[in-house]
């Protein structure tokens, strides 16, 4: 049964059509595969970002659509950059997005023994050799896009010698950088990836899964295809930058003794989102330099950052559905992402009132205290109502009052009337100012006959503003987030700090209505006339409420 969110956001459960589903349809129809088995294979060297959300939705979505399976596999072949913290965060992100992997999470490191055996098989077939060129020498020998490479002087070692040297590498008898295992393919290939790529290198580093068992680690290109084959993946889907690597993917599998049919790799365009950065290296620098508040800072493009900001799983899934799957690289406008969360929250978020830049209002002819009611959602009666204490002293937003204004200003003006949302019509009679000329109090009168109805004498009151009781409220901190960068493509900048938006976070102190005392972390609210907000999952608590701006009420604000 679909949730209300899924219904409102569109066709999450409808059939998708793209070049990958076309391939799968043909494979199933021809009998090449009887079922579909995909995988999502992140390297645990950072937190997942919005680009990974596209890959997650694609791989898990295909498995769901074709009633198949999808594995979560950690491509953990570089112990220097990886950490169990990233493993845990990736699992949490995938589950939060609404997906469940087949069985237990897999690790490429589960296959280290098998991978070592396949590497030895390539040596025995004369298809791999131990090279002792230094990394600099190897670069020099590799050639360029316009010049062929040169064979290493170690390329023609005997099979016996290579097996013995590979064993020595495994036993820690070479220092780091002094030896590597390379596939023997073609140093004159027009494809750089096929010029005798390194398939094993030495790293004396403890691994988060295997400890100190290994001091040699397989390279991604060697590991990935074999892991797919071991797990019987039918369709190995990755982004376009791995297109040339497919040649190596196929070469490795075709030259080892592994169960057929072999998996095949398909590439789609990665997500390029306007104004965001997805380089893990550059994101890590932002974290390490404390430019942001960790990987889950609400300005970060990470899934955990978007979650903390107030994005919902349904909104991210819908965004990925709308941008689709193609082979063409393009840049998606950030407003397309914002539209998805805005639609979701407009449909599902309860309403509340918050005054972010408060100024005091005193209603001089109101002496008692009333408890009014207001719907939690104008179109969703099943979400119920809330109580609004109405008192002699209130707060309104400073921007909602002027001493003088033209007719276009439909808020409170000295000597004129405005309606308070879900309450009465009030009239501004006079103001009190401090020594600097700043308004400290607006003195008003109210019309007691205007609760839920227009003035009896037929006079028109056009404006409506929000308010909070100055007595029954909760102080709150409001974090008004904006884009982290001032340019559309921050990834192209050498110095990303030079394009940081100095106003990406503005903090205000104000008040929220009483009903938000126990606001649930990450739950979205529409603060009427202000925007969509959620309680911060890290810092908000009942005695110190903190609300993050998720998105404005309308595009362009």
Swiss-Prot record:
Give residues annotated as binding L-glutamine. 75, 220
Keywords of the record, alphabetical order, are: Aminoacyl-tRNA synthetase, ATP-binding, Cytoplasm, Ligase, Nucleotide-binding, Protein biosynthesis
Q: What positions does the record give for the motif labelled 'HIGH' region?
A: 42-52
Reactions accelerated catalytically: tRNA(Gln) + L-glutamine + ATP = L-glutaminyl-tRNA(Gln) + AMP + diphosphate
Q: Extract the GO molecular function terms from the UniProt entry.
A: ATP binding; glutamine-tRNA ligase activity
Q: What class of enzyme is it?
A: ligase
Query: EC number(s) on record?
Result: 6.1.1.18
An example GO CC term for this entry is: cytosol
The GO annotation for biological process reads: glutaminyl-tRNA aminoacylation; glutamyl-tRNA aminoacylation
Q: Where does ATP bind?
A: 43-45, 49-55, 239, 270-271
Looking up Pfam families in the UniProt record yields: tRNA-synt_1c, tRNA-synt_1c_C, tRNA-synt_1c_C2
Q: Motif 'KMSKS' region: list the residue ranges.
A: 277-281
Note the NCBIfam families from the entry: glnS, PRK14703.1
Query: What family is reported?
Result: Belongs to the class-I aminoacyl-tRNA synthetase family.
> Under which name does UniProt file this protein?
Glutamine--tRNA ligase
């Amino acid at each position: 049964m679909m949730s209300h969110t899924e219904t409102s956001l569109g066709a999450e459960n409808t059939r998708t059509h793209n070049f990958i589903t076309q391939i799968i349809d043909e494979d199933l129809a021809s009998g090449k595969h009887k079922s579909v088995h995909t995988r999502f294979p992140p390297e645990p060297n950072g937190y997942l970002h919005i680009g990974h959300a596209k890959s997650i939705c694609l791989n898990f979505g295909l498995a769901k659509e074709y009633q198949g399976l999808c594995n979560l596999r950690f491509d953990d072949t570089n112990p220097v950059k990886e950490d169990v913290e990233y493993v845990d965060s990736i699992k949490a992100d995938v589950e939060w997005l609404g997906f469940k992997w087949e069985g237990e999470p897999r690790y490429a490191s589960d296959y280290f023994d098998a991978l070592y055996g396949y590497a030895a098989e390539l040596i025995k077939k004369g298809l791999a050799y131990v090279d002792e060129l230094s990394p600099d020498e190897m670069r020099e020998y590799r050639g360029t896009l316009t010049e062929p490479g040169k064979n290493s002087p170690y390329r023609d070692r005997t099979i016996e010698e290579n097996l013995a040297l590979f064993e020595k590498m495994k036993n820690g008898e070479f220092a780091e950088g002094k030896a590597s295992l390379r596939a023997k393919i073609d140093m004159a290939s027009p494809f750089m990836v096929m010029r005798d790529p390194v398939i094993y290198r030495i790293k004396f580093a403890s691994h988060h899964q295997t400890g100190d068992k290994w001091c040699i680690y397989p390279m991604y290109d060697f590991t990935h295809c074999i892991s797919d084959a071991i797990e019987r993946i039918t369709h190995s889907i990755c982004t376009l930058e791995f297109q040339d690597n497919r040649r190596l993917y196929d070469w490795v599998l075709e030259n080892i003794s592994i169960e057929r049919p072999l998996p095949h790799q398909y590439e789609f365009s990665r997500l390029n989102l306007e104004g965001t950065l997805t380089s893990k290296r550059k994101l890590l620098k932002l974290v390490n330099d404390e430019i942001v508040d960790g990987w889950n800072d609400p300005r970060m493009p990470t899934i955990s950052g978007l979650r903390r900001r107030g994005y919902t799983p349904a909104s991210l899934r819908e965004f990925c559905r709308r941008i689709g799957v193609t082979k063409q690289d393009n840049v998606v406008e950030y407003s397309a992402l914002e539209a998805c969360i805005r639609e979701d929250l407009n449909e599902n978020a309860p309403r509340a009132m918050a005054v972010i830049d408060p100024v005091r209002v005193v209603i001089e002819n109101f002496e008692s205290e009333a408890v009014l009611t207001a719907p939690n959602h104008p179109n969703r009666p099943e979400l119920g109502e809330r109580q609004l204490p109405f008192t002699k002293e209130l707060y309104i937003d400073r921007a909602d009052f002027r001493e003088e204004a033209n007719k276009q200003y439909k808020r409170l003006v000295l000597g004129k009337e405005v309606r308070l949302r879900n309450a009465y019509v009030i009239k501004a009679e006079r103001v009190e100012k401090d020594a600097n000329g700043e308004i400290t109090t607006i003195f008003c009168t109210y019309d007691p006959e205007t609760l839920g109805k227009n003035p009896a004498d037929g006079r028109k009151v056009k404006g409506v503003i929000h308010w909070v009781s100055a007595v029954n409220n909760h102080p709150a901190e409001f974090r008004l987030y904006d884009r982290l960068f001032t340019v559309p493509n921050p990834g192209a900048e050498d110095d990303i700090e030079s394009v940081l938006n100095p106003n990406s976070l503005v903090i205000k102190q104000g008040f929220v209505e009483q009903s938000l005392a126990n606001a649930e972390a990450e739950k979205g609210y529409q603060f009427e006339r202000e925007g969509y907000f959620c309680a911060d999952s890290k810092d908000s608590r009942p005695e110190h409420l903190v609300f993050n701006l998720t998105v404005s009420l309308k595009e362009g604000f």
